[in-house]
């Protein structure tokens, strides 16, 4: 409630986001430009208390917000959903923004100063770091594929928290959800025939809403990339 939504568009560089694919070879360039635009926007609006960003894509943002000439310094929260994607790029690319040399050094790799990592700098420059569960937080702490990323996370471990991710079961409650044709609750686990009858009616209502021909093949829904990490093979096995 009472939240304002702002859309940041880079009209002067619209070609950066006019790619035929969601992901491409110039992702770091695109998100460097977006980070710079976001930093300029945040400095131009009335002071905010907290800036919360997600994954490596805006990893440059905290470094830009902590520039010595910044009008104020909001607290910054960095949430990592996927520790495997980190935003490796050239240091030259980041140096073309308004980031100062001190904060730029947080992004550079010690083993190769010409290479920087969006996630690495984001870890060092943020005030708090979160991820999607306590278990995943522990997995991240035990991940050594890049020792410098591991060192960055270990250094910030005192402000690193795993917070269990999930839906709000008060809103998305099958017992009360107004979007369902047939409501049900866990008590129907003891009455499987009635449960499957209700689920069948919900499936039919969904197919009708989507303009699909109803059939008796399994219906599964997942909002995800279809990659090995997500385990799509389990759907087939099910």
Task: Give the positions of each predicted feature.
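Catalytic cores of nucleotide-sugar-dependent glycosyltransferases that transfer UDP/GDP/TDP-activated
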Residues: 1-238
């Amino acid at each position: 409630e009472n939240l304002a939504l702002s859309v940041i568009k880079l009209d002067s560089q619209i070609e950066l986001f006019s790619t035929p694919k969601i992901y491409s070879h110039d992702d770091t360039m695109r998100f460097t430009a977006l980070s710079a635009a976001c930093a300029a926007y945040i400095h131009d609006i009335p002071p905010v208390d907290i800036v919360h960003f997600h994954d490596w894509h805006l990893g440059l943002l905290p470094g830009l917000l902590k520039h010595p000439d910044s009008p104020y310094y909001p607290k910054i929260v960095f949430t990592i959903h996927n520790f495997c994607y980190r935003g490796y790029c050239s240091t030259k690319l980041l140096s073309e923004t308004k980031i100062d040399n001190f904060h730029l050094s947080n992004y550079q790799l010690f083993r190769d100063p010409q290479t920087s990592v969006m996630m690495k700098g984001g870890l060092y420059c943020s005030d708090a770091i979160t991820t999607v569960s306590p278990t995943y937080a522990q997995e991240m702490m035990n991940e050594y594929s890049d020792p410098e990323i591991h060192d960055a996370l270990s250094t910030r471990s005192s402000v690193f928290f795993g917070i269990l991710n999930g839906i709000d079961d008060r809103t998305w409650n099958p017992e009360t959800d107004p979007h369902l044709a047939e409501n049900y609750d866990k008590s129907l686990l003891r009455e499987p025939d009635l449960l499957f009858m209700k689920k069948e009616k919900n499936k039919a209502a969904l197919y009708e809403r989507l303009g699909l021909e109803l059939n008796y093949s399994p219906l599964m829904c997942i909002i995800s990339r279809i990659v090995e990490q997500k385990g799509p093979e389990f759907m087939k096995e099910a």
